[in-house]
Swiss-Prot record:
Belongs to the SlyX family. HAMAP family: SlyX. InterPro entries: SlyX. The lineage of its organism: Bacteria, Pseudomonadati, Pseudomonadota, Gammaproteobacteria, Vibrionales. It comes from Aliivibrio salmonicida (strain LFI1238). Transmembrane segments: none annotated. Pfam families: SlyX (PF04102). Gene3D superfamilies: 1.20.5.300. It comes from the Bacteria. This is Protein SlyX homolog.
């Protein structure tokens, strides 16, 4: 009977170690996910800025495709 108790104690100890490792892994994954979300949010802000800049660009200084001279290989 004492052997059974020792085996159960070893199994419980092993499960506690696994649980602690999993908790640490979950915390690390949560931190990584939070950092990625911040990066995504920052990139969305930057993208909106770039799109806004492109929309306000003066396209009148650009030539139409029909006015462009063809490349030399034509």
């Amino acid at each position: 009977m004492t052997t059974d108790i020792k085996q159960l104690e070893l199994k419980i100890s092993d499960l506690e170690c696994q649980m602690a490792f999993q908790e640490q892994t979950i915390d690390e994954l949560n931190d990584a996910l939070s950092q990625q979300q911040l990066l995504i949010t920052n990139m969305q802000v930057q993208m909106k800025f770039v799109v806004g800049k492109m929309k306000t660009m003066d396209t009148s200084s650009m030539a139409d495709a029909s006015e462009e001279t063809p490349p030399p290989h034509y």
